[in-house]
UniProtKB/Swiss-Prot annotation:
N-acetylserine: modified positions: 2
Sequence segments annotated as region (Disordered): 1-35, 116-191
One GO BP annotation of this record: negative regulation of DNA recombination
One Pfam family per UniProt: Linker_histone
Protein name from the UniProt record: Histone H1.2
Lineage: Eukaryota, Metazoa, Ecdysozoa, Nematoda, Chromadorea
Basic residues bias: start-end ranges: 152-183
SMART domains tied to this protein: H15
A GO molecular function held by the record: structural constituent of chromatin
Span of domain H15: 37-113
Main location group: nucleus
Family: Belongs to the histone H1/H5 family.
Keyword Phosphoprotein on entry: no
Amino acid sequence: MSDVTVAETPAVKTPTKAPKAPKSKTTKEPKAKVAAAHPPFINMVTAAISSLKERKGSSKIAILKYITANYKVGDQLTKINSRLRAALNKGVASKALVQSVGNGASGRFRVAEKAAATKKPVAKKPVAKKAATGEKKAKKTTVAKKTGDKVKKAKSPKKIAKPAAKKVAKSPAKKAAPKKAPAKKAAAPKA
């Protein structure tokens, strides 16, 4: 065994990976969101339902036909259909739409108008109260000339409030004028 000489194999150099040049980090600019060629689906649905004016409400198929005919939503009907279903379900959940017949996205849908009609009178009442309370504070100042007309209507039953509302800024001048007028009339017959 000692006679056998082992031929030395040249050491194979493992190819050392050249240090990669660090890639210059190019900050990819976020793609600007391209504005859609159509409004949100819930707006398109409400527009479709209101323009179709069907007595029992509009079906999903009729709404889909209206949207594809009037808006640029693309050619992929499966995507449009799924977004339409989602918009209908969301509209029913948020009470913007009323489902008159059916379950889920099937059936007939109408725009909920009763909720909008009941909200408007409620909003008007607090505004009138605020104007009335603001007028009480503003009697001493000359700022509330424009709101005087509105307050006159609200406080017409009270006799004390009427003169105060009419004579917001000119009350001293008007009071002085009636006092002088009787004096002149009294003086005129004597002379």
